[in-house]
Amino acid sequence: MKNFLESLIENNRQYVEHGKLASYIPELEKANKEDLGIYIVTLDGKEVGAGEYDKKFTIQSISKVITLMLAILDNGKDRVFSRVGVEPTGDSFNSIVSLERKPSKKPFNPMVNSGAILTTSLIEGDSEEEKFERILEFTRKVTGNDDIQLNEDVYLSEKETGDRNRALAYFMKSNGVIEGNIDDILDLYFKQCSLEVNAKDLARFGAMLANDGVLPWNGERVISREICRIIKTIMVTCGMYDDSGKFAVHIGIPAKSGVGGGIMAAVPRRMGIGIFGPSLDDKGNSIAGTHVMKDLSEELDLSIF
């Protein structure tokens, strides 16, 4: 398997040249565009990686899956989905247009920025610090890594350049869609996106989802089978931004990407996959990472469809 993964990485490394580093968060531009790595955790206990799988990067939008799970655990699925929809959108992940044209004014789904900000606002805690600590601890639990920390530089960079997210949040506030102190909610959102992970962490997270909400390494149930099914369904329809339909057709695996270059994927009852490749396509997904996923899916027949 290791030789197979190494060949996948080398065969697809050429695609990094066709992408760009995320530029709207200055700190993310410091990444090495050439990096590409993959890690796989199978449900029968095998772990194998190739390329830059142990290199740290920020989780970015993959954190939206974590906060969605936490919000559902805190509030129940009915309350969460009364506030945010589950419909895919053809607009970009930070679009304001989609909020304006929707009669209910609630965000389309929890994987676009507006929906994720609203989801974060539903997480319980007596203070912003307590809420962040809960997100951090939950992230450590689902990745099996107690050493995950906040990248302070990326957090400050996000905070400094997050005007589009502020616009989304205040637009929702003006329509009565979101409650609470907007500055505190956004600060929490910027922090959750700035947690440092590697491809191995993402693969272990994916393995938990592939295992119907149970951590494969210790048998602990983190979320119910039903919540896990909902999460994976939303990942299929909305997880790869406005490229989700194409990804479902050609690759067919529940996955979530982030502009830090990560892809977290879950092949039900088989494996979790973590990818790192910070060179992005025009949708904000890892360009070489997506090619790796396509080859992996075809070679191992991983599509759920």
From Swiss-Prot:
GO terms for molecular function: glutaminase activity. It comes from Clostridium perfringens (strain 13 / Type A). This is Glutaminase 2. Homotetramer. Its EC number is 3.5.1.2. Keywords: Hydrolase. Belongs to the glutaminase family. It catalyses: L-glutamine + H2O = L-glutamate + NH4(+). Substrate binds at residues 61, 113, 158, 165, 189, 241, 259. InterPro entries: Beta-lactam/transpept-like, Glutaminase. Gene3D superfamilies: DD-peptidase/beta-lactamase superfamily. Signal peptide: none annotated. It is an enzyme of class 3 (hydrolase). GO terms for biological process: glutamate biosynthetic process; glutamine catabolic process.
